[in-house]
């Protein structure tokens, strides 16, 4: 037997096997196996087709884009490069600012940077190359500048788009910021608030924030992917924070409810308690904040609820912080009609030009008619309507306003399901385009559904509030 074979036989079977395997590996080096890693959660083709986003809610997510790991983005919202509104939107925003200013309220606008601006590095290279970050950032900053020229106090949140932080600013599969994102935003906002006239006279006290638990977020983008593709994503867990006055832990007065805070926060669900944005503002401003934001409130929900409240009417704040995202259109005329009416409490305490009370039955109900006691001059541009249901849980108003020339307007106002309602709907008569000179003839209100109890309602027309008139602004001229 050859010596090398005898030597091989004397080795353990394991060693021999290893040597043999090594020999095979060397022999096959040129044909080594290759491996390909597939993404853990790829979106299905249906998610890339805008036609599949059929409901109003689903259209907020058009269209989903898969990114690294569990990250999802929306092409229309997260990856937008345009930040703008219509000339009518700018005019109304200016009028709103001037109206608040006339009541001694300074408005601070917190205009969130998009997920695309902040988290573009989470995109796959192909999508990142398609997203024009430089254009998006330039246009975002230009919009901040336009708010500022209208008179709003506007924190520059663009530095948040270039941060390298250990904790995510936004959730991977949700449009909301994390508590860490809220914290970093609040720090910048607080520096702007400290420059607002009147801040120096606001009572101060120290606050401190600490981690108080963990929250699990099943993201809205992940849920939408599940609806379209039947996929599921892991819950993302994140630290939760609580903010308390120093030395007063557990006193239950986190948002100053026992006192009269002179700073109020209105906004979207980003300002809800889950993310502690109001708490971080208190910590960095050193002052109490009344937080009236609620989940599902959208652009206007908490603002309208607050304007109609006794808190605002009797104790308006010195500083009002209004947080919202570029998702929301700023030219929604019906929203401004309500805000401007409620700023001076609708028709409360004002002489009635026309009024009536009735019980609504299913179908259209005639509530007000101009002419029963002589024809009155009720021009749209000078008047507003205040409608109150006895049932304070009513969240939807459907009305038809008739005019002397036979024209009519169908108006529908829906309050968020999550809002605390008072059964009240106050709004200016329509004055955009050529509506200002229309003469009101009648008001009809849609009654309750068949088979339900009748609804008692009172309606009143009065002269609208007089605020300083704003100069006409457009995106190009004056802004």
From Swiss-Prot:
The lineage of its organism: Bacteria, Pseudomonadati, Pseudomonadota, Gammaproteobacteria, Pseudomonadales. Residues 1-27 form the signal peptide. GO terms for molecular function: acyltransferase activity. Monomer. It is an enzyme of class 2 (transferase). Pathway: Glycan biosynthesis; alginate biosynthesis. It comes from Pseudomonas syringae pv. tomato (strain ATCC BAA-871 / DC3000). One of its GO terms (biological process) is alginic acid biosynthetic process. Its main location: periplasm. GO terms for cellular component: periplasmic space. The gene is algX. The active site is at 174, 176 (proton acceptor), 269 (nucleophile). Residues 27-347 are annotated as: SGNH hydrolase-like domain. Disulfide bonds join 44-229, 347-462. It comes from the Bacteria. Residues 348-476 are annotated as: CBM domain. This is Alginate biosynthesis protein AlgX. Belongs to the AlgX family. Plays two roles in the biosynthesis of the exopolysaccharide alginate: protects alginate from degradation as the polymer traverses the periplasm, and also plays a role in its O-acetylation. Probably has acetyltransferase activity in vivo. Its EC number is 2.3.1.-. InterPro entries: ALGX/ALGJ_SGNH-like, AlgX_C, AlgX_C_sf, AlgX_N. Consists of two domains, with an N-terminal domain with structural homology to members of the SGNH (GDSL) hydrolase superfamily and a C-terminal carbohydrate-binding module (CBM) that may bind alginate. Keywords: Acyltransferase, Alginate biosynthesis, Disulfide bond, Periplasm, Signal, Transferase. It is found in: Periplasm.
